[in-house]
Amino acid sequence: MAAVKRIVVLPGDHIGREVVEEAVKVLGAVEQSLSDVHFDFQYHLVGGAAIDATGSALPDEALGAAKEADAVLLGAVGGPKWQGGAVRPEQGLLKLRQELGVYANLRPCNFAADSLLELSPLRPEIARDTDIMVVRELLGGSYFGERHEDEGDGVAWDTDKYTVKEVQRIARMAGFLALQHDPPLPVWSLDKANVLASSRLWRKTVEETFQSEFPNVQLQHQLIDSAAMILVKNPRAFNGVVVTSNMFGDIISDEASVIPGSLGLLPSASLASLPDSKSAFGLYEPCHGSAPDLPAGKANPIGCILSAAMMLKLSLNMVAAGEAVEQAVQEVLDSGVRTGDLLGSSSTSEVGDAIALAVKEALRRQSAAGLS
């Protein structure tokens, strides 16, 4: 009997709907190639689409389904239509993350195919072999701290608050990921400990956690502003795992995202626990936004497709299938089937079609070699 994997699909707004469709198409190709798995896709509204239909950016029905799922696949939320309202699409995404307890946001920065090197804004000799995993704390800091809006007095403030437990668990995620390699990957912790009290607690806690629990992992600390400079000057200096707070992680991962040539390429996973059993609950979404100005058929679906690959590897205990998707993406990019952001002429669906076909062939090769 085939194992049922329940996946809640939240397309969201604008290009979110398009890229999710292609990721589901690729997952469908995986299912068609394997006899022992069935994907149960359950679609729900989130973001602006949910506001229009229900008045809420995250309807109770969608949240309830997400909590019962094995994993959640999300497209993108937001757009100018909803920015002036009392309820904003982004509120739904923040609530979803908080309610699901996904405290660790994993954002890889690497080249999905070597042929993309020429598209990097950095010189090839600088960008080549960049391979960074940014681990962003997702449920603390200024995005969730106490705040005061300007109410006519000309004053507004946010609170960047962290507890030892919050820092410990994200440090453990970074240490765990480092230990998945032999030898262990180095870990860089980014903070602003020369100015911020929260960063001093961060640095102290990360240091103590690694000393007691990950003594064989090389840990280095770097101030966030100098890290931003180094990332452009010599990104390979951070090859390994980079762990940092919510706001700093948001910024540094977006900076890193341009290195491979397009934000549309990069996936992300937000996990509620260590993926030590390859079955951690996770929320998966591309790093890009909803791009409301982009015409239909122009969006790059690869970031969402690679997010689905991460889901297979980290939440659905289907590591070989996830690797097959990654291999298919590489082959399709190398063949020249690309969207306009990568100087190609293929549509969103054409890229998805090509990757789905390549996935079937990659899984056939795995089966022939006895690897699946």
From Swiss-Prot:
Biological processes annotated in GO: L-leucine biosynthetic process
The reaction(s) this protein catalyses: (2R,3S)-3-isopropylmalate + NAD(+) = 4-methyl-2-oxopentanoate + CO2 + NADH
Cofactor(s) the record lists: Mg(2+); Mn(2+)
Positions of Mg(2+) binding: 225, 250, 254
Database matches in PANTHER family: 3-ISOPROPYLMALATE DEHYDROGENASE
Site (Important for catalysis): 143, 192
Organism: Eremothecium gossypii (strain ATCC 10895 / CBS 109.51 / FGSC 9923 / NRRL Y-1056) (Yeast)
Chain's role: Catalyzes the oxidation of 3-carboxy-2-hydroxy-4-methylpentanoate (3-isopropylmalate) to 3-carboxy-4-methyl-2-oxopentanoate. The product decarboxylates to 4-methyl-2 oxopentanoate.
Top enzyme class: oxidoreductase
Keywords: Amino-acid biosynthesis, Branched-chain amino acid biosynthesis, Cytoplasm, Leucine biosynthesis, Magnesium, Manganese, Metal-binding, NAD, Oxidoreductase
Assembly with partners or alone: Homodimer.
Protein name: 3-isopropylmalate dehydrogenase
Lineage, highest ranks first: Eukaryota, Fungi, Dikarya, Ascomycota, Saccharomycotina
Cofactor note: Binds 1 Mg(2+) or Mn(2+) ion per subunit.
An example molecular function term from Gene Ontology annotations: NAD binding
